[in-house]
From Swiss-Prot:
This is Cytosolic Fe-S cluster assembly factor NUBP1 homolog. Keywords: 4Fe-4S, ATP-binding, Cytoplasm, Iron, Iron-sulfur, Metal-binding, Nucleotide-binding. Pfam families: ParA (PF10609). It comes from Nematostella vectensis. Residues 1-10 have a biased composition (Basic and acidic residues). Belongs to the Mrp/NBP35 ATP-binding proteins family. NUBP1/NBP35 subfamily.
């Protein structure tokens, strides 16, 4: 056989065989481990189904953060609300924070359940043009803990992408867990088949957050995920009465803008700290429509406009 090395033991099955490195003839061969582990995995039949399912989704945006507690899910929700403010847009949100799903709460969808239709799982709709899917809809109680290892998380993410009927969505916004984990690798692996616009990375001004964001950006570069830009959340506190600005989290090393310059990625803007944002999320409401005159609302709208312009430009280039 042409695929049997010259120095191979007798009865070698060959390097291209399914039995390569696994039969008794392979015992003692110095190449046994290489042969046993180097067989390429068969193509995943679900990748084609995912590509077909998402072919009707124009733009796909991942929202990332290096650390928890920086307002990533809050930003995801208000990015979606801001996009859906245009009634001609269809917007979808996918929550892949499997172990800590907060998206149902910030959209006011706690207690909702997933429904099956002839074309797959149906998202839960906040508005006629804003649908949401989350593992939170699959839990019996909001307090139930999800204790899953990587393969099971991977399977659910695949099922969300393959089986949910997203329809003709203009934007799919994906809320991810903090850091870089199995969920990130899975979603990028699957979405790579479907032309992802890129990632928005959310941080706070202090160095302890920026340190992890640098790693997040490096991760994006390694997996060839474009970085749409960095958002500095909770940049300053603006007093709702006197409008005076105060730094709650001082940018000891120059903040997110300086870090973005160093990492050679775009800086999208700063969102000031407003306690009413937290209240709106707890109540499942859109802060942008509830408090339209807040400086934070203006910041959100400016950032969302930049993201839309980026996505439109990337669509024309592809």
């Amino acid at each position: 056989m042409a695929d049997v090395p010259k120095d191979a033991p007798e009865h070698c099955p060959g390097t291209e065989s399914d039995k390569s490195g696994k039969v008794s003839a392979c015992q003692g061969c110095p190449n046994q481990q290489i042969c046993a582990s180097s067989k390429p995995a068969p193509p995943d039949p679900d990748l084609g189904k995912i590509k077909e399912r998402l072919s009707s989704v124009k733009h796909k945006i991942l929202v990332l953060s290096g650390k928890g507690g920086v307002g990533k899910s809050t930003f995801t929700a208000h990015l979606a609300h801001g996009l859906a403010a245009d009634e001609d847009r269809q917007v979808a949100v996918l929550d892949i924070d499997i172990c800590g799903p907060s998206i149902p709460t910030v959209f006011g969808l706690q207690g909702e359940q997933v429904h099956q239709s002839g074309s797959g799982w149906s998202p839960v709709y906040v508005e006629d043009n804003l649908g949401v899917m989350s593992v939170g809809f699959l839990l019996a109680k909001p307090t139930d803990a999800v204790i899953w290892r990587g393969p099971k998380k991977n399977g659910l993410i695949k099922q969300f992408l393959r089986d949910v009927d997203w329809g003709d969505a203009d934007f799919l916004v994906v809320d991810t867990p903090p850091g870089t984990s199995d969920e990130h690798l899975s979603i990028i692996q699957y979405l790579n088949q479907t032309e992802v616009d890129g990632a928005v990375v959310v941080t706070t001004p202090q160095e302890v957050s920026l340190l992890d964001v640098r790693k997040e950006i490096s991760f994006c570069k390694k997996v060839r995920l474009p970085v749409i830009g960095v958002v500095e959340n909770m940049s300053v506190f603006v007093c709702p009465n006197c409008k005076k600005e105060s730094q709650i989290f001082p940018p000891t090393t120059g903040g997110a803008e300086k870090m973005a310059v160093e990492m050679k990625v775009p800086f999208l803007g700063r969102i000031p700290l407003d306690p009413r944002i937290g209240r709106a999320c707890d109540e499942g409401k859109s802060f942008l429509s509830e408090i339209p005159d807040s400086p934070a609302t203006s910041s959100y709208k400016d950032i969302i406009e930049k993201i839309v312009k980026y996505c439109v430009a990337s669509q024309h280039q592809s």
